[in-house]
From Swiss-Prot:
Pfam families: Big_2, Ice_binding. The lineage of its organism: Bacteria, Pseudomonadati, Pseudomonadota, Gammaproteobacteria, Alteromonadales. It is a lipid-anchor. Keywords: Antifreeze protein, Cell outer membrane, Lipoprotein, Membrane, Palmitate, Signal. It comes from Shewanella frigidimarina (strain NCIMB 400). Ice-binding adhesion protein that adsorbs this bacterium onto ice to maintain a favorable position in its aquatic habitat. Inhibits growth of the ice crystals. Has high thermal hysteresis (TH) activity, which is the ability to lower the freezing point of an aqueous solution below its melting point. The TH activity of this protein is approximately 1.4 degrees Celsius at 25 uM and little below 2 degrees Celsius at 80 uM. InterPro entries: Big_2, Ice-bd_prot, Invasin/intimin_cell_adhesion. This is Ice-binding protein 1. A lipid is attached at residue 24 (S-diacylglycerol cysteine). Gene3D superfamilies: 2.60.40.1080. GO terms for cellular component: cell outer membrane. Belongs to the ice-binding protein family.
Length: 892
């Protein structure tokens, strides 16, 4: 639960040294705060939460996490460009906060173009349900509170679909008697005078109430815990103040007390009672409240190395390849330092894999070897698995690009191995440009346009190579667009502006770092050379971006709104040891506005032995790294207002199974040998249909669309059959004929089906699959049985345990049947339908009105009964797929 309390307190600033990360290939060290200046590029974006669902009327905060070419990550939520592909279903603002408009599903995309004209984006699906609010509940119920104290209320909504989300920040809070008690927009009530008041939470036409009694009890004494603790420098110690009142009731008054440290050079205190060791020594910690006080002596010792983290964790490399491991030392003062070059590296089995003094692992022969990094009597291990595969081809992407002279393009080399697996080998290939007068390319695959013309960019490894053509244009700048437009900003806050250029050849590019930025009224707002604006005083100023004779402006309004409260999300998340969690801080201001203040607040972890904040000196990023199993309070504070949540760290997850390579079948929502039939009322979204061994006439029940291959029941997809003539039917690229495309699809379906029968899966031990899956919760793994399997007695819950890449494989020797009274599949903690595979040696029957998730590979028939909803894919290897008024959405 979040708590927000405003106080006057001293802000102690610390000078944090930026820790430089060593590059894998001997590049110059890069400071993450200057990525663009040092050639560090944005390589990917991850949007969380993944595929969320919420009832109409609520809001969903999305977070965008950027990963850079030097291996670092940072929260880019506030600088990314957010978009919804259907604003009639849901809208999203510039801070990633989405609001539903009507029931339906939309693609939410976060994109960012860095100063090298390198664009990355990520998309997730937001589902707005038509679930209606059936009940509201407030907790705690009918509490008592001493005058002058505060009480946090929580509102929980129960919806018609059975979900019960926390709606504390979505409801409207009110107090019937504000002379007795007040309540703010976050549900925090304050006792003003003796008496009682009805506290109401309302959402739409629904509301619920509870009674808050304010007593005249007076504070008799305060007790502090722990008593005389000792901590290492940099460690945070949480103190608790318990007040005993004249009526005999004891209350936690930690958040209401005024905290102080007698020697702030030794230890500092925040407003929530957390002390942080600054230097060696002792200081008296005092809590004051309502004329009472209590003290405790805090002793601070020197900082020490507390743990080592190795990345990547448990990697796989082909025989003959190398892999750079990184060792990060976590110190008690919260500093994370790259100790790769100073650690002592060793391999438990040098016949399988060796490791040099710089942490570079070489795969010698197939098998597994434990790699250890040791420093200061501490060590960390990871298991490197060497696979007996060889590189068969190299692909360079994106293909055939056109860029403007003077700009850059990041290229990626992907290797395909003899076992069909793919790997990003960008950093290990040799890059070259056929014409360096036109374009150059560095050893990280970053191509630069030098002069107009074209050049072949190649990536090679041994005798293998892949290439793409890069065209450099000398297009003229036609216009500039500044975004976001007509922004409102709270005084003291920052906002990143972007300038997008449109050239005479129709191309566009981010020129944010090459334009000249200006503010018409620098007393109201300033803006730096990179387009970062800062609100100085209430008023308006015109922000302008200029390049040559072209310019564009937008109005920036600065308000003097004050920060009322902070929300930290996600609330009380759980992650595994050695992983990370990105927190988002949202500020609620006195003018009713909300702003993403993730990069502005000060972040702290109450127990840095469990979790640290902002590793590698990514200042105020809100990124927590899990060090040990346990829990730690994560706090965000700004201007005397703070909020906290609890991060729970669990043990590392078991090995993740390898998923099959789908090849051409990945494009299909349904693929069948003999036929695909439906009754009226079916809807298929985001995937193609295919019949492998029969003519197009074996599609039954579908309504032909305007163009060849289209069905009215099929959205964002086409249907295919082996006898389709061309034209009017269009053969997918790169195939020369429809027959060739169908043959390849048949081959890829067989490969995936056979892979799912592998025992054991190359990356995880096979477990026995229960013959009844109802009322079970299963974690990732391979589940196998020779018998028939049913899902009928209840709901099957698949738990991703916080890893959105968790793979679930069910290999069934008979039939799979779901249906009443159970039959639903529920995905929690990051589990995704696209990573679930059902392989049956018989038929698969999906029960009436059930909700099914996963990719079905059935040897014979797939029968989806009336009203069932499927998120995944349906493949009938030798038979047909039968629908009956169903909704099928391909899992992407």
């Amino acid at each position: 639960m979040n708590h927000s309390i405003k106080k006057t307190y001293l802000v102690f600033t610390m000078l944090l040294g930026f820790i430089l990360l060593a590059g894998c290939n001997g590049d110059n060290n890069n400071d993450n705060s200057n990525n663009d200046n040092n050639g560090v590029l944005l390589t990917s974006i991850a949007v969380t939460p993944a595929t969320p669902s919420m009832p109409l009327g609520l809001k969903q905060q999305f977070t965008a996490m950027g990963t850079y070419s030097d291996g670092t990550s940072s929260d880019i939520t506030n600088s990314a460009t957010w978009s919804s592909d259907d604003s009639t279903v849901a809208t999203i603002n510039g801070s990633g906060l989405a609001m539903g408009v009507i029931p339906g599903s939309v693609a939410i995309t976060a994109s960012l173009i860095d100063s090298s004209s390198n664009e990355q984006s990520a998309t997730t699906t937001l589902t707005i349900t038509d679930a209606t609010l059936t009940a509201l509940a407030i907790t705690p119920v009918n509490p008592s509170l001493a005058k002058g104290l505060t009480k946090q209320f929580m509102a929980t909504g129960t919806y018609s679909d059975g979900t019960s989300p926390d709606v504390t920040t979505s409801v409207t809070w009110s107090s019937a008697n504000t002379l007795v008690a007040t309540v703010n927009a976050s549900g925090l009530a304050s006792g003003v005078a003796i008496g009682s008041s009805i506290i109401t939470a309302s959402l739409g036409s629904d509301e619920t109430t509870t009674e808050l009694n304010i007593t005249d009890a007076i504070l008799s004494s305060i007790a502090l815990t722990p008593v005389e603790p000792s901590i290492a420098k940099g460690i945070t110690q949480q103190f608790t103040a318990i007040g005993t009142y004249s009526d005999g009731i004891s209350v936690d008054i930690t958040a209401s007390s005024n905290w102080s440290s007698a020697d702030t050079l030794v230890a500092t205190m925040n407003t929530s009672g957390a002390a942080k060791g600054v230097s060696i020594g002792s200081s008296i910690i005092t809590a004051d409240f309502q004329a009472q006080s209590a003290t405790s002596l805090l002793t601070v010792t020197d900082a020490s190395l507390t743990s080592i983290m190795l990345t990547p964790a448990n990697p796989h490399i082909p025989k003959g390849n190398t892999l750079q491991l990184t060792a990060t030392g976590i110190y008690s003062d919260g500093i994370s330092v790259d100790i790769t070059s100073s650690a002592i590296w060793s391999s438990a089995d040098t016949l399988i894999a060796t490791v040099n003094a710089d942490g570079v692992v070489s795969g010698i022969t197939s098998g597994s070897a434990i790699i250890t990094a040791t420093s200061a009597a501490l060590s960390a291990t990871t298991t490197v698995t060497v696979t007996d595969t060889t590189l068969t081809s190299i692909a360079v992407t994106p293909g055939n690009q056109t860029i403007v002279k003077g700009s850059n393009k990041q290229l990626t080399a992907t290797g395909t191995y003899s076992d069909g697996s793919l790997a990003n080998i960008t950093a290990s290939v040799t890059w070259s440009s056929a014409d360096t007068l036109v374009a150059t390319v560095n050893n990280s695959g970053l191509a630069s346009g030098i002069e107009t013309g074209s050049s072949l960019i190649s990536a090679s490894s041994g005798a293998l190579s892949g290439s793409t053509n890069l065209t450099i244009t000398g297009a003229a700048l036609n216009s500039i667009v500044v975004s976001p437009t007509n922004l409102s900003l709270v005084k003291g806050m920052n906002k990143q502006f972007a300038a997008t250029a449109t050239y005479s050849d129709g191309s566009v590019a981010d020129i944010s770092t090459s334009v000249t930025w200006s503010s018409a009224d620098t007393l109201v707002a300033t803006i730096d050379v990179n387009g970062l604006a800062n609100g100085k005083a209430a008023g308006s100023s015109l922000i302008t971006a200029t390049s040559g004779a072209q310019s564009n402006s937008t109005n920036l309004t600065v308000t003097d709104a004050t920060l009322n409260s902070i929300d930290v999300t996600p609330i009380n998340p759980s992650i595994i040891k050695n992983s990370s969690q990105n927190f988002v801080a949202t500020g609620h201001y006195s003018d009713g506005s909300t702003t993403n203040i993730t990069s502005t607040v000060m972040w702290s972890s109450a127990d840095t032995l469990v979790a640290t904040l902002n590793p590698n000196e990514q200042l105020n990023s809100g990124r927590a790294t899990a060090i040990e199993v346990g829990s730690s309070v994560i706090q965000a504070s700004l201007s005397g207002v703070f909020a906290d949540t609890t991060l729970n760290v669990t043990a590392a997850l078991p090995n993740n199974p390898l998923a099959p390579e789908l090849g051409e079948v990945a494009r299909f929502a349904m693929l069948a040998s003999q036929a695909i039939t439906t009754t009226s009322g079916s809807a298929i979204v985001d995937g193609d249909l295919g019949i492998l061994d029969q003519a197009r006439s074996y599609y039954a029940g579908f309504t032909p669309g305007v163009n060849a291959g289209e069905f009215d029941e099929l959205t964002n997809g086409l249907s295919y059959a082996g006898d389709d003539s061309t034209p009017p039917y269009v053969v997918p690229v790169p195939y020369a004929s429809m027959v060739a495309f169908i043959n390849q699809s048949r081959t890829d379906l067989g490969i995936a089906y056979n892979f799912l029968a592998a025992d054991p899966n190359p990356n995880a031990a096979t477990q026995v699959c229960p013959i009844e899956l109802g009322n079970l919760t299963l974690t990732r793994g391979v589940y196998k049985t020779a018998a028939d399997v049913t899902l009928q007695t209840g709901t099957l819950t698949l738990d991703g345990e916080g890893d959105p890449d968790s793979v679930f494989i069910f290999t069934i020797g008979g039939n799979l049947t779901s249906g009443a009274p159970g039959g639903d599949i529920v995905l929690i903690n990051g589990a995704q339908a696209k990573n679930i595979y059902w392989r049956t040696a018989g038929k698969t029957v999906i029960g009436t009105n059930t909700n099914f998730s996963g990719n079905v590979f059935a040897w014979s028939e797939v029968n989806v009964r009336t009203g069932a909803n499927v998120t995944g894919r349906l493949f009938a290897v030798t038979d047909q797929v039968t629908l009956d008024a169903n909704a099928v959405t391909k899992a992407n």
